[in-house]
Amino acid sequence: MIRTVGRLVYTPPVVPQDVAHSGPFGKLKVALVADYFTSVCLSAECRIRSLPTDNYRDVIGKWRPDLVFVESAFHGVQGEWRYKLARQPKYIRMSRPRTIRRLAQLVRDKGIPAVFWNKDDSAFFDAFIDVARLFPYVFTTDNTCLPRYAAQLPSGSRADVLAMPY
């Protein structure tokens, strides 16, 4: 019910897609699974494409990003990733988070560097640890979470602190 009403009264803002810029990162192509604010911030520096849940394979295959950047998004641009990343209580969960797993496998198979950034640590460490485990590089905003990531990430994955000013 809440989702249905929400779609009727709220129109998500549009994020500029694939706009080249001057500067050191102006040609860097970044495919994103991120909320609106992060997407807009990154779109000012590099070429971005928001990955849709139903068409990410085509975007990856045709656009050929230099990097896939996934953040601890609760909705994603246009609400595409709502309830598809964070661990949800059973009474809310509509389905298992298969799409993000398939995306992570696809970019791994294609050799595209991929990172996960938990901008919501430490409060939402547990909500996003399953997603973090899918990526070879994990960044957190909270350095006190580094030992937790070291203990829970698969061998070969690396966790570090990333402060990304807006």
Q: Predicted segment positions?
A:
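Internal alpha/beta domain cores that form substrate/cofactor-binding pockets in large enzymes
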Residues: 16-64, 68, 72-112, 135-136
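Catalytic core of nucleotide-activated saccharide and alditol-phosphate transferases
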Residues: 4-12, 108-166
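Membrane-proximal basic amphipathic "stem/tether" segments
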Residues: 1-23
